Amino acid sequence: PGARGFGFIRRVPVNGESAFLAQLRRDASADIGIRQLEPHGGDRYVIQNIEPIERNLAAVGLDIASEANRRAAADEAARTGRAVITRAITLIQAPSQSQRSFLLLLPVYRPGLPLVSRQDRQAALAGWTYAPLLIDEVLRDVDLNQPQFALALDELTDGRAMLGIGAG
């Protein structure tokens, strides 16, 4: 509960951007471009698809590497081979919910390649499966008014709490 959808983010080398866009436009049957939150050099991490598309269309084509928080989480997932959640963000498809969302990112590697070292994983990286999470939707069915129930969500960065949300 609370996932606004499930999608795939493709790692696109700068020199592969034109071919990727042509394929994306064929698949989506729409004139979709790569959008950035802030200009940056290097590979693009582009939201290629997400379901359900109806409530997430605004996210398709977004280069998540163009925002430091999203890029850092994606890079950590790629390096470690583990699922990583971003720090609090504002979803493109839910702009009125400022800093109330997260992306859960899990790296996807091309088959048949070694994944022993960080360098192996970086070379084999195809992209990430991901789920955008809006905290209000995640907690919608949780009754925080029960006296025996306490909930604390903390964002930890380098072992330090950066954001705390508590109830109970």
PLM features: residue spans?
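Intrinsically disordered, low-complexity polar/acidic regions
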Residues: 1-168
